[in-house]
Structure formats: structure tokens, C-alpha cells
A protein has these predicted regions:
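Arg/Lys-rich, alpha-helical DNA-contact motif
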Residues: 1-23, 37, 42-48, 53-89
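Short coil turns linking two alpha-helices in DNA-binding domains
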Residues: 28-31
């Protein structure tokens, strides 16, 4: 569990590692990884190991929206379609 100080430091970064985004959002590591694999979360790959780095503001905003839609009972397929349609407009 991250400390309050660690979360404050994470909130200041422009890009977050997968584990940091999970901590900040209060979701499981596997959730972030799965949503990334589905193309729901934006990220850049960097370094020799091609680690994923998430733009903090955009990724947290998108994740909140995904979680809200999931609470409303939307399937991941419906959420993917929603974002595709929204991107097209």
C-alpha cells in the first residue's frame, strides 16, 4: 500500500509506470495491464525492455471513465465501441 507521500509524488509525474497508475487509481495491476492490451489506455513504450509509461492526466481520466461505464453495467466490448465512436467524431 503506497504512503500518502508516495501518492503525492506519483501525482506530480507526467508519465507513470503501470504499477504507479494502478496505485493511484486504486485498481489492480492486472486491470491496468488488461485494459492496455485491449487498447483502452494510452501508453508509450520506452527503454531497452519497452516498459509501458502512461501519460498521467490522460490515462487517469480515461480509467475513471472506463470504471464509471463498468459500474453502469457496460461490457468491455461496448466500452471499446464507445471510445472508437467518440474518437471518430
Amino acid at each position: 500500500m503506497p504512503t500518502k507521500r508516495n501518492l503525492e509524488q506519483i501525482k506530480q509525474r507526467e508519465f507513470l509506470k503501470l504499477v504507479e497508475l494502478a496505485e493511484l487509481a486504486g485498481v489492480r495491476y492486472s486491470t491496468i495491464k488488461y485494459y492496455s492490451e485491449l487498447g483502452l489506455l494510452p501508453y508509450e513504450q520506452r527503454g531497452d525492455r519497452l516498459a509501458k509509461y502512461y501519460p498521467r492526466a490522460e490515462a487517469t481520466r480515461r480509467l475513471k471513465e472506463i470504471l464509471k461505464l463498468r459500474k453502469q453495467g457496460k461490457t468491455l466490448t461496448a466500452i471499446i465501441s464507445y471510445f472508437i465512436k467518440r474518437q471518430a467524431t
